[in-house]
């Protein structure tokens, strides 16, 4: 636990016997809860790192940091800390010089005290009622200023003694003043609701909770008297000095401090972190403090002039006693050519000195008395509008011409002369400067006239040099080189490398004070450093040589080898903790080289990195708007400035060509804009016709264009009626009368049965049974029978019943046959319906699947439409901004007519009505100056905008050529994705592009290799991919693959895909903090700077309540449309979610029909068919037997014929021809 001391403090009384001395006893048990808020100062004046910093704030003269980290100079180096356990009624004095540090809590320093901090170290809200009644600041010169606050406003200049500055939370507002002899000199403002810290610097700054409340002359001592309270609080008094530190701030309070007091802490400060990981870090350049000045000039005969400027200040008191500097204060220049208004330097050298006098007056303007007490003031000359400071004139600044003047005529810039009082700086006059840049005249600190070589060199140490006009900071060293030509020598980048002394011809080198280095940090300590020169740094004394750099380390290389020998002969066997390319550093600081080829026969990557490559895409249409022209603006300058007032127009002529320049600039810009737009765009009448939807749908418009093509748009849009369903003239239909006279019966038929039946009957009902049809071998008749058929078959049935007993039942046979045939028709219909039912169910399920897929595509389309609407909304927002920008600029220009620019009114006529002509001219001159400034700002903005539009117009040309007329290979140029095609259309003031691109929806992450490091015997070489569009990676199967970066399509790498490089070393280029400004120039926000300037003058403006009805400019308001598009986009997104649910529901509605049973019945042939078959068989078999057995030469018929023939005719027997065998089938 920290040891806490509270010392006995006896302070001299400054208010007589009214207050007793402050008696403080040692802290006992009551201090136990305050240990977290009070610290013991560490050796060197450092605050412990575990201190909570309750109620410690960053002191600032400008804005306050809310949260973050920054490196800053703050009074955080504690010389002495006094803890006080409670407020006592006492009066105490604290001085910056000669303070008694005999008894302090912790270490004590004897440094110069810069700031005394009073901290209420308590975390809870302590109620006010304890604190100082008044703070007295004993400034230089013996003047004592008092600061106190009151709970209400005080109207007179006399303040009673009830004021106070309470510590802790205050009840209600407290109004603070600076007092002198009981008279208010200045109102400071309202006290914060809770006072946690009061800090006072010896330079006269008074801080409350870190904010600069008040500034005055330097302070010697601080006195205050304490009130008495009934609650125990704890506070400390810290005597502090400024030091550089890394400060972490949260909610405006300090939470952590890292002192930039050592090499490793300097790196922490440069990296803005209190903890450093193991690795290499650039060593930040140390700040060059007060160094010697080296100047190298050519020997010459010089003349010198002393320019003495005398400033006589006139001071008065206000009605409340505040000091006021009179504008009648005079500036006296040396007389030249009987003129004291202008003085020009006519010698080779000059030195400027300022002498200040101060006289005071009571109520008149006769300044005779000496300035005493609060009226004491000193003249100071501030920079003003000049690009150099007044106090730097004697610091070897060079000119071709330099003059000081009391009149602004012909001046290039001016210095501001102010009277510095104990409360503030008050502007009194301006000192004008007429100068030309060059080297003829030099400002020097002292007289060096005559023939001299004024060169002053400080060798082998860091010096601020000016060598033949080239300035910088570096170390100048004498060399042994001899160069015949040249005066000074620079590198290709323009840095000064050396110079020659023309008197003796000696060559001197110039090197930076700090060189670039990389520090190796392991476990928070510096173990080594890499540098380009052989010079000790970072307190590292051991070093070794590598082929490319020097390495300094804590490792003692001299134990075994000679100090400074190459690293190759100092092989160290240790495991590197950090690596840098092929360099490794061990924990003991030893440097080792890592050979990337030392592996078990496996190849190694030169370097690797994870990349994501698309595997799937979706098509997206992205909208982009580009402005290509602006609306020309012309302004009547004299009308704008003077509004037709003749006296104002006469004054305006004194501004030479101001109006002409403004008007010509706008006109020239407009003409140039129109010429470029006309050369870029042309209007086609046919294109204008096509731009109309009505004309596009008209074939008359397209006929002259597409004579040899079908009329695109017109023909097909008009011809829709030809492809819509219509009546077919070839088909025959019954008329409406026929539909009334006949009953229409619709049935389901079997194939062509019905048509064949109708064709057979010919309309005769008697042919019904005769025309019976057969379907798949079964006799059928149509199922519908008209009245005649029913009568016929009824009669047949009745006749059969009646004659059945008499043997006439056969009459009913037609009826029975017809009934069975019709029943067969119905049965076959049922079979066909069953098959149709199966076909229907299959088709329905297939339709459901198609519907599901269709809805999925609709869902995707709506999703893409939603994204498209979003891009359209963004493009419309940009269109709206472009269209309204010029209107807003004109509106802002019109608003400037309301500003009076510190004149008594913004109306010129009103000014001339209220003042005499001379005074009115002065007021109107302010209006003219202000309005011309506004016009200049508008012209500058317009010309800048035109330059931006000119660049945008060129971009539109490039996009038309690359995106619309061709396909771009540049990713992201034609939409954010892989470009397919683009369409362009006109838009307000520009063009709108519709880019169709492929957007990745899925990715594959691979570890890409920049190249392969291979070993060939003793030679190490690298292989890199020949085509840079391909990515090399190694898969899990240890094979190398190549894939395009645009889509993941891996293929096996072959030897033809690689080219060989010499080595595997990777070159890392580093820079230091000092080099960053040359790489990243400081960004200066001009708009913010102008805004800050305007804010400083705004309280002095009088802005009348004027309407803006006179201003009329088209204002494009697409906010509602953009909001509607965004709403529709969101609604479409919600629709996609609903469609996804509907698709799931549709998938659950697939039909599973219950099939009808199919019964197959084999119908036997009738009996008469079998009888007929039997008769045919009985007749045909004997006939066949007869033909086969009785014919031929051996047949009985043939034998019988031969016998008969031989008997009756001998002659015929001789001419016998054999009979051939005949088969009868």
From Swiss-Prot:
HAMAP family linked: ALPHA_CORONA_SPIKE (MF_04200)
Subunit details: Homotrimer. During virus morphogenesis, found in a complex with M and HE proteins. Interacts with host ANPEP.
Higher taxonomy: Viruses, Riboviria, Orthornavirae, Pisuviricota, Pisoniviricetes
Motif (KxHxx): 1221-1225
Superkingdom in the source lineage: Viruses
Region (Heptad repeat 1 (HR1)) location: 813-932
Entry remark concerning the domains of this protein: The KxHxx motif seems to function as an ER retrieval signal.
Virion surface-side positions: 13-1166
UniProt KW keywords: Coiled coil, Glycoprotein, Host membrane, Host-virus interaction, Membrane, Signal, Transmembrane, Transmembrane helix, Viral attachment to host cell, Viral envelope protein, Virion, Virulence, Virus entry into host cell
Its membrane topology: Single-pass type I membrane protein
Name listed for the protein in its UniProt record: Spike glycoprotein
Species this protein is from: Porcine respiratory coronavirus (strain 86/137004 / isolate British)
Gene Ontology annotations of biological process type: endocytosis involved in viral entry into host cell; fusion of virus membrane with host endosome membrane; fusion of virus membrane with host plasma membrane; receptor-mediated virion attachment to host cell
Annotated segments matching region Interaction with host ANPEP: 433-577
Biological role: S1 region attaches the virion to the cell membrane by interacting with host ANPEP/aminopeptidase N, initiating the infection. Binding to the receptor probably induces conformational changes in the S glycoprotein unmasking the fusion peptide of S2 region and activating membranes fusion. S2 region belongs to the class I viral fusion protein. Under the current model, the protein has at least 3 conformational states: pre-fusion native state, pre-hairpin intermediate state, and post-fusion hairpin state.
């Amino acid at each position: 636990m920290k040891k806490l001391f509270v010392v006995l403090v006896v302070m001299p009384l400054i208010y007589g016997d009214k207050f007793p001395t402050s008696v403080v006893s040692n802290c006992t048990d009551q201090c136990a809860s305050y240990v977290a808020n009070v610290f013991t100062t560490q050796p060197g004046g450092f605050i412990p790192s575990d201190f909570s910093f309750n109620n410690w704030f960053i002191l600032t003269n400008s804005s306050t940091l809310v949260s973050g980290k920054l490196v800053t100079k703050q009074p955080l180096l504690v010389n002495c800390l006094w803890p006080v356990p409670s407020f006592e009624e006492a009066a105490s004095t604290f001085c910056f010089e000669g303070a008694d540090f005999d008894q302090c809590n912790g270490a004590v320093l004897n440094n110069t005290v810069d700031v005394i901090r009073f901290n209420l170290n308590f975390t809870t809200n302590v109620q006010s009622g304890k604190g100082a009644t008044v703070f007295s600041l004993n400034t230089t010169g013996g003047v004592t200023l008092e600061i106190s606050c009151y709970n209400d406003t005080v109207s007179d200049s006399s303040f009673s003694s009830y004021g106070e500055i309470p510590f802790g939370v205050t009840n209600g507002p407290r109004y603070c003043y600076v007092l002198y002899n009981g008279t208010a000199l200045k109102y400071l403002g309202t006290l914060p609701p809770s006072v946690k810290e009061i800090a006072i610097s010896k330079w006269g700054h008074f801080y409350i909770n870190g904010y600069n409340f008040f500034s005055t002359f330097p302070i010697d001592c601080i006195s205050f008297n304490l009130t008495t309270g009934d609650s125990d609080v704890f506070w400390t008094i810290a005597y502090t000095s400024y030091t550089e530190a890394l400060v972490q701030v949260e909610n405006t309070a300090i939470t952590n401090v890292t002192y930039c007091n050592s090499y490793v802490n300097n790196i922490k400060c440069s990296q803005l972190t209190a903890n450093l990981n193991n690795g290499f870090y650039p060593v930040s350049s140390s700040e060059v403090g007060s160094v010697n000045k080296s100047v190298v000039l050519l020997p010459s005969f010089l003349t010198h002039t002393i320019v003495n400027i005398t400033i006589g200040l006139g001071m008065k008191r206000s009605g409340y006693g505040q000091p006021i500097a009179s504008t009648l204060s005079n500036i006296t220049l040396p007389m030249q050519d009987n003129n004291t208004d202008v003085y020009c330097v006519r010698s080779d050298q000059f030195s400027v000195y300022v002498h200040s006098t101060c006289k005071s007056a009571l109520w008149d303007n006769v300044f005779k008395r000496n300035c005493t007490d609060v009226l004491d003031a000193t003249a100071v000359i501030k920079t003003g509008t000049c690009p150099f400071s007044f106090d730097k004139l004697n610091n070897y600044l060079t000119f071709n011409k330099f003059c000081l003047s009391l009149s602004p005529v012909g001046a290039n810039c001016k210095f501001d002369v102010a009277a510095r009082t104990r409360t503030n700086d008050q502007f009194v006059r301006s000192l004008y400067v007429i100068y030309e840049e060059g080297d003829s005249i030099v400002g020097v600190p002292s007289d060096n006239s005559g023939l001299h070589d004024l060169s002053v060199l400080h060798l082998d140490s860091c010096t601020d040099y000016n060598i033949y006009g080239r300035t910088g900071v570096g170390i100048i060293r004498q060399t042994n080189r001899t160069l015949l030509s040249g005066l000074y020598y620079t590198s290709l980048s323009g840095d000064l490398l050396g110079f020659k002394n023309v008197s003796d011809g000696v060559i001197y080198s110039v090197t930076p004070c700090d060189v670039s280095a990389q520090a190796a940090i392991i476990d928070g300590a510096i173990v080594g450093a890499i540098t380009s020169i052989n010079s000790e740094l970072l307190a590292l004394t051991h070093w070794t040589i590598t082929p490319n750099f020097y390495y300094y380390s804590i490792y003692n290389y001299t134990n075994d080898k000679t100090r400074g020998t190459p690293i190759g002969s100092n092989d160290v066997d240790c495991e590197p903790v950090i690596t840098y390319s092929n360099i490794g550093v061990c924990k003991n600081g030893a440097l080792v080289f890592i050979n990337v080829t030392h592996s078990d026969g496996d190849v190694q990557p030169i370097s690797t990195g994870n990349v994501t490559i698309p595997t799937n895409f979706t098509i997206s249409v992205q909208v982009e708007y580009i402005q290509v022209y602006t609306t020309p603006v012309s302004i009547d300058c004299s009308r704008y400035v003077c509004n037709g007032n003749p006296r104002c127009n006469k004054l305006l002529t004194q501004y030479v060509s101001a109006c002409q320049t403004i008007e010509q600039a706008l006109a020239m810009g407009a003409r140039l804009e129109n010429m470029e737009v006309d050369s870029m765009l042309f209007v086609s009448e046919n294109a204008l016709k096509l731009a109309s939807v009505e004309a596009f749908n008209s074939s008359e418009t397209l006929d002259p264009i597409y004579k040899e093509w079908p009329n695109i748009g017109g023909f097909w849009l008009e011809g829709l009626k030809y492809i819509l369903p219509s009546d077919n003239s070839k088909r025959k239909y019954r008329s409406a009368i026929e539909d009334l006279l006949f009953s229409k019966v619709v049935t389901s038929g079997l194939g062509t049965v019905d048509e064949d039946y109708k064709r057979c009957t010919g309309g005769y009902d008697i042919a019904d049974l005769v025309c019976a049809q057969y379907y798949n071998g079964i006799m059928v008749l149509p199922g519908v029978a008209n009245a005649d058929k029913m009568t016929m078959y009824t009669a047949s049935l009745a006749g059969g019943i009646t004659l059945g007993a008499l043997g006439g039942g056969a009459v009913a046979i037609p009826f029975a046959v017809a009934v069975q045939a019709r029943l067969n028709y119905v049965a076959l219909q049922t079979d066909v319906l069953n098959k149709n039912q199966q076909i229907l169910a299959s088709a329905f399920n297939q339709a459901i699947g198609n519907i599901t897929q269709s809805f999925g595509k609709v869902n995707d389309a709506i999703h893409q439409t939603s994204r498209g609407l979003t891009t359209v909304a963004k493009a419309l927002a940009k269109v709206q901004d472009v269209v309204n920008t010029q209107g807003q600029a004109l509106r802002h220009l019109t608003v400037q007519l309301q500003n009076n620019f510190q004149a008594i009114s913004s109306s010129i006529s009103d000014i001339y009505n209220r003042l005499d002509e001379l005074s009115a001219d002065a007021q109107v001159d302010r209006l003219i100056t202000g309005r011309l400034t506004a016009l200049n700002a508008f012209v500058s903005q317009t010309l800048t905008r035109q330059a931006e539009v000119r660049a945008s117009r060129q971009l539109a040309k490039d996009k038309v050529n690359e995106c619309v007329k061709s396909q771009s290979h540049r990713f992201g140029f034609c939409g954010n994705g892989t470009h397919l095609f683009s369409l362009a259309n006109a838009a307000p003031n520009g063009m709108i592009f519709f880019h169709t691109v492929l957007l990745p929806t899925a990715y594959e992450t691979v570890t890409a290799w920049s190249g392969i490091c291979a070993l060939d015997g003793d030679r190490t070489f690298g292989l890199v991919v020949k085509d840079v569009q391909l990515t090399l990676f190694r898969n899990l199967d240890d094979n190398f693959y190549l894939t395009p970066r645009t889509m993941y399509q891996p293929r096996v790498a072959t030897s033809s895909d690689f080219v060989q490089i010499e080595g595997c070393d990777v070159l890392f280029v580093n820079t230091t903090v000092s080099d960053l400004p040359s790489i990243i120039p400081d960004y200066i926000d001009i708009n913010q700077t102008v805004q800050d300037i305007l804010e400083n003058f705004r309280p002095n403006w009088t802005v009348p309540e004027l309407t803006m009805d006179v201003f009329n400019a088209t204002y494009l308001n697409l906010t509602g449309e953009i909001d509607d598009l965004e709403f529709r986009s969101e609604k479409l997104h919600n629709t996609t979610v609903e469609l996804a649910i509907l698709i799931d529901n549709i998938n659950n509605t697939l039909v599973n029909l219950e099939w009808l049973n199919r019964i197959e019945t084999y119908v036997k042939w009738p009996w008469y068919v079998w009888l007929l078959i039997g008769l045919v068989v009985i007749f045909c078999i004997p006939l066949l037997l007869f033909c086969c057995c009785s014919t031929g030469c051996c047949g009985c018929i043939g034998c019988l014929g031969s016998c008969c023939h031989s008997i009756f005719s001998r002659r015929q027997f001789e001419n016998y021809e054999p009979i051939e065998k005949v088969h009868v089938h």
